[in-house]
From Swiss-Prot:
ATP binds at P131, T132, G133, T134, G135, K136, T137, L138. This is ATP-dependent Clp protease ATP-binding subunit ClpX. Component of the ClpX-ClpP complex. Forms a hexameric ring that, in the presence of ATP, binds to fourteen ClpP subunits assembled into a disk-like structure with a central cavity, resembling the structure of eukaryotic proteasomes. Pfam families: AAA_2 (PF07724), ClpB_D2-small (PF10431), zf-C4_ClpX (PF06689).
Length: 431
């Protein structure tokens, strides 16, 4: 180590004088100078480096603590966040909030639970039952956003047993890996939503002698990844090939949410309730919408078995949440209330063009009425509006003088042009 303020003649001092390779200070300007291979560093630069490292480590630690806390969002907080994006479905929101909280609390607790002395907490996979367009997919997607975890959606009807044409169940994990940018640690704590799960039910409760490669066979194939296993996944998706490098994905901490409409399930439930009440089967009459909602809320694992899900699959779905059909009031609220309501999205797009977008109340009511007739729930709201807004948004970028665009009932009913406002007071209908 060379030190500053060396004694001796001027010539000897010049020979001993060295400069810091980082800041350029000479040895007589600092307290000490450390020599390395072809380089020197002074005590001031060392102190600066220590301060920088401490600051960076502190920031990393804070971020890790923040991420750790974020995973354990309380059920009430999860429900409140869901309320910002999903209208109604209070029963389903509460069930999802509890299931998700328990799932990620289970993951965090694995670091300190004793293997022999503590109770093993099983996975809390979720089954969502409800008509088309009631918010099953949106609930799952919103949960993933709240928790900041990778998320992917899979259509159960595209899955087949290994060895048959179609996607095998391990392709689900490949999609989750892609959603996580191939960050294995994040992927192994992600959420997978399997839609149309009711479409892979057996056609009857009796075991068929024929091979069901897209029904019961897929249910059997899903069992291991639902419960927790290490599966080899091709790095870029697709089918496995001999000598191919595989990424081993552990599914024990992946949350699976399965959803389906389960059309006809209310008849299965009604038959069971009738048998319990009368002691024998009675004629099943057509149930009203209100009665169907009440029946679906009383679903049991036995009903799901009678519908066509195998017992092992049902056993891996401990949380069952039912969703209600959407009435006109709910659809109207979906149009305008959620944080990402479709009308708010259109208003934002128009705002980017410096145009204010206004929807007349009568126009919104007609959108709802049209959506109800189409029978696809909230999905129909978007399709109805897109049909109306397409031509308007096509022409809007060329209409530099427009300040306000008003969507009227005639726009929905007759595909008429909207009312445009030019400047502060002049209202003019488009030619």
């Amino acid at each position: 180590m060379a030190k500053g303020k060396q004694s001796g003649s001027s010539n000897s001092r010049d020979e001993l004088m060295v400069n810091c390779s980082f800041c350029g200070r000479s040895s007589d300007e600092v307290n000490s100078m450390i020599a390395g291979p072809n380089a020197f560093i002074c005590d001031r630069c060392i102190q600066s480096a220590v301060d920088i490292i401490k600051h960076d480590l502190s920031a990393i630690t804070t971020k890790r603590r923040s991420n750790k806390t974020a995973k354990l969002v309380k059920p009430t907080e999860i429900r409140d966040e869901l309320n910002k994006y999903v209208v109604g479905q209070e029963r389903a929101k509460k069930a999802l909030a509890v299931a998700v909280y328990n799932h990620y609390k289970r993951i965090e607790s694995q670091e300190w639970l004793l293997e022999e002395d503590d109770v093993v907490i099983e996975k809390s996979n979720i089954l969502l039952i409800g008509p088309t367009g009631t918010g099953k997919t949106l609930l799952a997607q919103t949960l993933a956003n709240i928790l900041d975890v990778p998320f992917t959606i899979v259509d159960a009807t595209s899955l087949t047993e290994a060895g048959y044409v179609g996607d095998d169940v391990e392709s689900i994990l490949a999609r989750l890996l892609q959603a996580a940018d191939y960050n294995l640690e994040r992927a192994e704590k992600g959420i997978i939503y399997i839609d149309e799960i009711d479409k892979i039910a057996r056609k009857s409760a009796n075991v068929s002698i024929t091979r069901d490669v897209s029904g019961e066979g897929v249910q059997q194939a899903l069992l291991k990844i639902l419960e927790g296993t290490v599966a080899g996944v091709p790095p870029k998706g697709g089918r496995k090939h001999p000598e191919q490098h595989l990424i081993n994905v552990n599914t024990k901490n992946i949350l699976f949410i399965c959803g389906g409409a389960f059309e006809g399930l209310e008849k299965v439930i009604s038959r069971r309730l009738a048998q319990n009440a009368m002691g024998f089967g009675t004629a099943i009459t057509a149930a009203s919408e209100k009665e169907s909602i009440e029946l679906i809320s009383k679903v049991t694992p036995e009903d799901l078995y009678q519908f066509g899900l195998i017992p092992e699959f049902i056993g891996r779905m401990p949380f069952i949440a039912t969703l209600d059909p959407l009435n006109k009031e709910a659809l109207k609220n979906i149009l305008i209330e959620p944080k990402n309501a479709i009308t708010k999205q259109y208003k934002k797009l128009f705002e980017m063009e410096n145009v204010e977008l206004i929807f007349d109340t009568d126009a919104l009511d007609l959108v709802v009425d049209t959506a109800v007739k189409r029978g696809t729930g909230a999905r129909a709201l978007r399709s109805v509006l897109e049909e109306v807004m397409l031509n308007i948004m096509f022409d809007l970028p060329n209409m530099n003088e427009v300040k306000t665009c008003i969507i009227t009932k005639e726009c929905i009913e007759k595909k008429a042009e909207p009312m445009y406002l030019y400047g502060e007071s002049e209202r003019k209908k488009s030619a």
